[in-house]
Swiss-Prot record:
A zinc finger (CCHC-type) spans 104-122. This is Retinitis pigmentosa 9 protein. Residues 184-212 have a biased composition (Basic residues). It is found in: Nucleus. The gene is RP9. It comes from Homo sapiens (Human). It comes from the Eukaryota. Appears to be expressed in a wide range of tissues.
Length: 221
């Protein structure tokens, strides 16, 4: 008998991996290619950054100005000097094609102002009087709008006053007409009384005259 293993032994020992479908294999190769390309780009960027950050060859270093040198080295300033020595030196990433200030807001993530500035759309207005003063000095249309509102208010007040005066004048006229009617009625009554008194006086005179004539006639007889 031969010592060579049979086909069954070979199949059991070195079983091949099942072949992937063509679509999955193509996708896997694309993913590997993309990762390789990204790694190459990252290495290239690192090389450029390190190249530009390195000093030119043959540079003789002199006394370098350290950021902590702006604070005098006296007792009590150790914490501030240490903070400046380990402070970050890189600035913010700037947007491409925009000329902005070297600052970025933490709230709205926009460039050109800091957190808490009045230019921020998320700025919380505090003192209303100070805000009105600022708007009046910064916005040229503020005075015109305020004058227009004041003029409209004055016109409305004048209209209401005119309506009130008209209503009061109508009431006065009605009251005056009623009082005039009462006075006329009183005058008529007075005239009637005066006429009655005159008539009564005339009657009394006539009676006296008749009685005097009758007395004279009786005396003559």
């Amino acid at each position: 008998m031969s010592s060579r293993p049979g086909r069954e032994d070979v199949g059991a020992a070195g079983a091949r991996r099942p072949r992937e479908p063509p679509e999955q294999e193509l996708q896997r190769r694309r993913e590997q290619k993309r990762r390789r390309h990204d790694a190459q780009q990252l290495q290239q960027l690192k090389h450029l950054e390190s190249f530009y950050e390195k000093p030119p060859p043959g540079l003789i270093k002199e006394d370098e100005t350290k950021p902590e040198d702006c604070i005098p080295d006296v007792p009590g300033n150790e914490h501030a000097r240490e903070f400046l020595a380990h402070a970050p030196t890189k600035g913010l990433w700037m947007p491409l094609g925009k000329e902005v200030k070297v600052m970025q807001c933490w709230r709205c993530k926009r460039y050109g102002h800091r957190t808490g500035d009045k230019e921020c759309p998320f700025f919380i207005k505090g003192n209303q009087k100070l805000e009105q003063f600022r708007v009046a000095h910064e916005d040229p249309m503020y005075d015109i709008i305020r004058d227009n509102k004041r003029h409209e208010k004055d016109v409305r007040i004048q209209q209401l006053k005119q309506l009130l005066e008209d209503s009061t004048s109508d009431e006065d006229r009605s009251s005056s007409s009623s009082s005039e009617g009462k006075e006329k009625h009183k005058k008529k009554k007075k005239k009637e009384k005066h006429k009655k008194r005159k008539k009564e006086k005339k009657k009394k005179k006539k009676r006296k005259h008749k009685s005097s004539k009758s007395n004279e006639g009786s005396d003559s007889e």
